[in-house]
C-alpha cells in the first residue's frame, strides 16, 4: 500500500492544490512520516478546527468520498487484518451530495462558526480574533 502522505506529496508536485482540515495536532509517528515529504510543509494548506469530525475528500467539486474512516493505518486498512477498523464510506459524482459537503468544508475553512464556538482556545487557526 502506498503511504497516503506520499500520494499527497506527489499530487502537490503535479500542481494539485490540497486543503486539509483536521481536529487536532497529529501524534509523533504521523509527524515523523509527514517530515519525510518537504513539499507537504511548504504547499499543503491546513487548518486545525477542534470541532471537525467529518471525513471527506472532494476532488475539483466533481467527485467526493465521505465516510467513517479516519486517515490512520487502522482506518484506511493498512494495519494487519486483525487490527483494521470496520469502516464504511461513499464515493460519488452526484452533485446533490457533493454540494453540501463542499459548502460545509468551505464554511469551516473560512471560520464561519468561530464566533460561537466554545473551543476557540484550542484553535490556533481561528480567523476570528
Regions found by a protein language model. Give the residues of each.
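PLD/PLD-like phosphodiesterase catalytic module centered on the HKD motif
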Residues: 1-129
